[in-house]
From Swiss-Prot:
The keyword Ribonucleoprotein does not apply. It comes from the Eukaryota. SMART domains: S_TKc (SM00220). Residues 38-290 form the Protein kinase domain. Belongs to the protein kinase superfamily. CAMK Ser/Thr protein kinase family. PIM subfamily. The active site is at D167 (proton acceptor). Its cofactor is Mg(2+). One of its GO terms (molecular function) is ATP binding. ATP binds at L44, G45, S46, G47, G48, F49, G50, S51, V52, K67, E121, D128. The modification Phosphoserine is found at S8, S98, S261. It is found in: Cytoplasm; Nucleus; Cell membrane. This is Serine/threonine-protein kinase pim-1. Keywords: Apoptosis, ATP-binding, Cell cycle, Cell membrane, Cytoplasm, Kinase, Magnesium, Membrane, Metal-binding, Nucleotide-binding, Nucleus, Phosphoprotein, Proto-oncogene, Serine/threonine-protein kinase, Transferase, Ubl conjugation.
Amino acid sequence: MLLSKINSLAHLRAAPCNDLHANKLAPGKEKEPLESQYQVGPLLGSGGFGSVYSGIRVADNLPVAIKHVEKDRISDWGELPNGTRVPMEVVLLKKVSSGFSGVIRLLDWFERPDSFVLILERPEPVQDLFDFITERGALQEELARSFFWQVLEAVRHCHNCGVLHRDIKDENILIDLNRGELKLIDFGSGALLKDTVYTDFDGTRVYSPPEWIRYHRYHGRSAAVWSLGILLYDMVCGDIPFEHDEEIVKGQVYFRQRVSSECQHLIRWCLSLRPSDRPSFEEIQNHPWMQDVLLPQATAEIHLHSLSPSPSK
């Protein structure tokens, strides 16, 4: 049964990465103006990354998200093959925006005198995982397993494309409530994946690994696995396990909800204090708790379609 489901999910894993040299998006200055192509709607959110608005593509009424990033807030820059200097986020999104459905797609981008504007896909209806958990509490393990599998596949896809997200958390995961599909969003803290050590980190501290807290050094893959462990705990317990630096470096995990022993084992494995003790993506996927995963559409039918939105806490 698991094999058939894995085969059904194989299209996610086998999705190719975009070749930056086959550049499909022309530099912003060569395109029609933003205002003639997109209708800007209400503000969806804002923060250190800039502001994100809902929008509509005029040509076909496609819902989009329109992200404005001020140039003076951009700390990491990249370069396209044609020499255009752009935020690293654009480079990373172009590398991962392919046929794979588990990562948000960059549809277009524009450069303005003092900012960049990114046009991203926007599923409807949609809710981020943070709000989903806040409204409904800790997830049933069957639902958490389906969600976690999809996030793991998204992170694997990014790594296969040479991209390290560096801010895996519930707020950066969108749930398509009709299809049961998850999408990893916000690559503003990301970097090109490398085998050597990283000495910078702009992600969310409570999801960061103990080696970063203690030594300001970490390796990309093992740090990603730590963040995945935090995320899985969040799913099955309804909140993150650690709030303060001293809790992160101690790494003592206490379960506030009734969680199966297999799920507890996987979480504790991902949250091993020594990076070398953490599992690989393949070991996570082969873990006993990860077997018999629901397909996204089944997840939607069983767990999402029957639920009506409840008031936020």
